[in-house]
């Protein structure tokens, strides 16, 4: 009997194929593109501020205002190896995808910004919002889903203060509007218009772009050009 046609060989081949698929899927899912989610049309209301004492997380704000988290916009402040502050805004129940942000700004990596960097841009940690900021002091990336929202709450760039009834298309300032959120199962693919499906995988290896981070720290440098 041909050993290549044995049951064991066929099972091994299936296992190898599944392993390859899983390894490929894991990093692909991290940066999977997704369509902006639609939002129910609403009549715009007048923008105003409201005091939110001690509410420096989107969950605390929504609880204080008795508002659904899907009607809020949250901020994530990042910086990159190129320097500069990057303020990212997504719907309150979504997560910023750092891989998408890295690609959007043409950087090698992004990391969390410091409180000092945030204040230098004219805003306040825990109360950041995309209204009234100077685009010369920061890059503002807004997820495409946010621009379909209406009458939302967001930070007012003042301590213990938030905006309510903000209209993103009317009130927000930004550098770019694009897909920067982490995709989830059921989201629509922007290419085939099908719906994404998530599957559990096993990561057996990964390549990290470390550049000179560790070599410089360990003084592992060349003594001369040769």
Name each region found by the language model.
Residues 1-226:
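Extended, low-hydrophobicity, polar/charged segments
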């Amino acid at each position: 009997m041909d050993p290549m046609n044995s049951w064991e060989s066929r099972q091994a081949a299936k296992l190898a194929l599944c392993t390859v698929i899983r390894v490929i899927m894991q990093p692909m899912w991290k940066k999977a593109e997704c369509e902006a989610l639609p939002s129910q049309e609403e009549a715009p209301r007048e923008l105003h501020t409201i005091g939110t004492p001690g509410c420096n997380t989107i969950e605390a704000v929504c609880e204080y205002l008795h508002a659904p988290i899907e009607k809020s916009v949250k901020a994530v402040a990042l910086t990159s190896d190129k320097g500069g502050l990057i303020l990212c805004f997504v719907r309150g129940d979504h997560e910023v995808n750092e891989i998408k942000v890295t690609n959007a700004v043409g950087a090698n990596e992004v990391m969390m910004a410091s409180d000092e960097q945030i204040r230098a841009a004219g805003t306040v940690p825990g109360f950041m919002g995309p209204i009234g900021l100077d685009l010369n002091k920061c890059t503002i990336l807004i997820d495409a889903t946010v621009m379909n929202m209406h009458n939302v709450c967001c930070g007012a760039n003042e301590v213990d203060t938030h905006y309510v009834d903000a209209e993103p298309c009317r009130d927000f300032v930004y550098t770019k509007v694009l897909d920067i959120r982490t995709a989830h199962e059921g989201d629509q693919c922007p290419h085939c218009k099908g719906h994404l499906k998530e599957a559990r995988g096993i990561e057996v290896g990964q390549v990290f772009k470390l550049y000179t981070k560790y070599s410089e720290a360990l003084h592992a440098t060349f003594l001369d050009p040769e």
